Structures are given as C-alpha cells and as structure tokens.
C-alpha cells in the first residue's frame, strides 16, 4: 500500500494550480473560479452517490478519488489549508456526533 496522503494531494493541487491553464486542468479550474470548481465538486459528489447506491465498488472508488481531488481544489481557491479541515475534524472527535450537532449554531 502506498503512503500517499491527502496532504500529498494538497501539495500536488497547489503546484498544478500555479501552472498555466493551457497546461493543467487544475490551473484551468482554478482560473475559472470558485463557482465553476464548486459545481464540479457537486457533480463528482452526485456521481459518487450514484455509484454507492448502485453498489459499484470500482465506480465508487474512482468517484471518491475525483471527489477528494475537487474538494482540495475548492479549498485551494478558498485559501483554506487542509490542516484547518483536519483541525476541525480533530475538534469534533472529542464529542459525540449528537453533542457536536447540538453545539452548532442554527441557521
């Protein structure tokens, strides 16, 4: 098994985002802006859901990879480092799911 991590992918996304949009899909997506990147993230999420419902293991694996990649692109555009997401996950693990949800502000 590879030691590849989400942090590795975050570094790859950052490097590719700095490239020319003519040479990099990531740079092209970043140049298109957050709305386009977020729509692409949503498309990938729907495709992952469809694969999960269909019990398509290979499809779900592939769509999950696409989903993680596009999430990191959206985070890059928003200037939110993965370490901030990890910190939030760590904070939440100190509570039960019900307690964490109850502590959230209501919209």
From Swiss-Prot:
It catalyses: 1-(5-phospho-beta-D-ribosyl)-ATP + H2O = 1-(5-phospho-beta-D-ribosyl)-5'-AMP + diphosphate + H(+). GO terms for biological process: L-histidine biosynthetic process. It is an enzyme of class 3 (hydrolase). Its EC number is 3.6.1.31. Pfam families: PRA-PH (PF01503). GO terms for cellular component: cytoplasm. Belongs to the PRA-PH family. This is Phosphoribosyl-ATP pyrophosphatase. It comes from Agrobacterium fabrum (strain C58 / ATCC 33970). The gene is hisE.
